[in-house]
Amino acid sequence: MDDKKMAVNLRNDDLSEETKTLISSLPSDKDSTGINVCKYQGCWYTHHFLQAVLNFQKNFKPQDTNIIVASFPKCGTTWLKALTFSLVHRSKHPSHDHHHPLLSNNPHVLFSSSPRLFSTHMPSHTLQEVLKDSTCKVVYICRNMKDTLETFESFCKGVNFFGPFWDQVLSYWRRSLEDPNHVLFMRFEEMKAEPHEQIKRLAEFLDSPLLRKKKRTDCLEINKTGKLCEGRDNKTFFRKGEVGDWKNYLTPEMENKIDMIIQEKLQNSGLKF
């Protein structure tokens, strides 16, 4: 199966009878917008997203050269996927190329035969069974959870898409400690503060190191206009990308509540925000 056909297959979200039966047995709730969600392998999904996850677990055949970009939603997935695509294909598409694919395409619609590049919001343990016999690489990017909130209430309750946040981030943090050659843990804030050092780190992890003489990291504008094939605007994948923007929205009481939750959930993990 070629990459494009596989992607369509993995997005086929018609609920099977098997999935409907599974959903009836799972913990269920509603998200902040009133959409029905269910908890599968410790993670909350809409019913259609769950079908896609099950399709992935059943049909995906990893290749050792695959690269998977993972994150919680709104943590820099599109940015990291664009950087990863640029790094592994820079011999074919240098950043100064006026016809670079990223100038006219969203990173999420770009396909390449090798290495294949994918992105996901699934937690590490959901990927693990599928990838257990593969040496493919996973790059995870996390971000201060206060800058990723959809709603304060859903975060505190832990009932949000691909959440709870703390369970997902811990799943990748622990995997990166257990298997640093195949799982890289990155931080959005560090990428903003020291882009050259972090991109160098990413390139080395991907076995695509930057030239030693290179003094700076070239910039490449990503296409933020147009629509994807399923009709979603490209701009829906982009936010301000500002570090600390949460201060414009959260009260001191809300900030303290979130800090207390995170301190409790990440206790003794070695991971700090």
Swiss-Prot record:
Catalytic residues identified in the record: H121
Record localization: Cytoplasm
EC number(s) recorded for this UniProt protein: 2.8.2.-
GO molecular function: sulfotransferase activity
Binding residue positions for 3'-phosphoadenylyl sulfate: K74, C75, G76, T77, T78, W79, R143, R239, K240, G241
The UniProt record lists the keyword Cytoplasm: yes
Keyword DNA-binding recorded: no
Keywords: Cytoplasm, Transferase
SUPFAM superfamilies: P-loop containing nucleoside triphosphate hydrolases (SSF52540)
Cellular component terms (Gene Ontology): cytoplasm
Family according to the record: Belongs to the sulfotransferase 1 family.
Function: Sulfotransferase that utilizes 3'-phospho-5'-adenylyl sulfate (PAPS) as sulfonate donor.
PANTHER family: SULFOTRANSFERASE SULT
Name the record gives this protein: Cytosolic sulfotransferase 4
Organism of origin: Arabidopsis thaliana
